[in-house]
């Protein structure tokens, strides 16, 4: 497994005091009743919308590209709802790291866990397909409480945040792997482990192919799904951590497994995977991470979409 960050007294250096202050404030806020946290998170998101103009434009542009049939009024409403979800995403990160299991369980409805058990009965590994919802951090904790697995992550540039996010994620999971460690993922899957994996972002031109995603005909999509499924023999199980409306809690939804995905070539698998991604996103489109420049990588010589 990856050499994971550990706490050291170096993290108490004055350069990290501001980060510690932010962590302390987040810890205090998430001790409040959940309905209060919900209102604060949505309010924080609306406030962020006023200042994060560049990100708001990215959200609007992504919606424009993916849903050209959506009216301008509908897009503007979606941008507001998405930023409310951004604010809640920060709160949910604190909840994921600092809440006890019993409190998370109280606000979580689990749907489809039988799909995980069915695959485990076949003695096969599970590639848990996680989409970049803004509930993602909490969703990983919720899933780990049902079935501890192995997370895939990108190390944070701030050593304190890197340690804290690792500590928080390991509260209900077995270990973490660097997202570039394909050999480690394949090894774990062959052992029958559950490995979290997100194929929905733009990871650049290397190891990517251009296939459709929503109304975008050429979306750079990772070939990792093809490599992992082909080399490990794992089943793919998509999961959606969805926030209920009006502060009523969460649904953790596991969709039916796909144990024989199309693996003819990388393009075929990537196009199929994007259809799965679309289905998941449409289960809670306002909660997806539209702030990401999903279509920044373009074929050579083709102008930027942003």
UniProtKB/Swiss-Prot annotation:
Induction: Is expressed at all temperatures, but accumulation of htrB transcripts slightly declines with raising temperature. Thus, its expression is not induced by heat shock. GO terms for molecular function: acyltransferase activity; Kdo2-lipid IVA acyltransferase activity; transferase activity. GO terms for biological process: Kdo2-lipid A biosynthetic process; lipid A biosynthetic process; lipopolysaccharide biosynthetic process; response to stress. Its EC number is 2.3.1.241. It is an enzyme of class 2 (transferase). Pathway: Glycolipid biosynthesis; KDO(2)-lipid A biosynthesis; KDO(2)-lipid A from CMP-3-deoxy-D-manno-octulosonate and lipid IV(A): step 3/4; Bacterial outer membrane biogenesis; lipopolysaccharide biosynthesis. It catalyses: dodecanoyl-[ACP] + alpha-Kdo-(2->4)-alpha-Kdo-(2->6)-lipid IVA (E. coli) = alpha-Kdo-(2->4)-alpha-Kdo-(2->6)-(dodecanoyl)-lipid IVA (E. coli) + holo-[ACP]. PANTHER family: LIPID A BIOSYNTHESIS LAUROYL ACYLTRANSFERASE, LIPID A BIOSYNTHESIS LAUROYLTRANSFERASE. This is Lipid A biosynthesis lauroyltransferase. It comes from Escherichia coli (strain K12). The lineage of its organism: Bacteria, Pseudomonadati, Pseudomonadota, Gammaproteobacteria, Enterobacterales. The gene is lpxL.
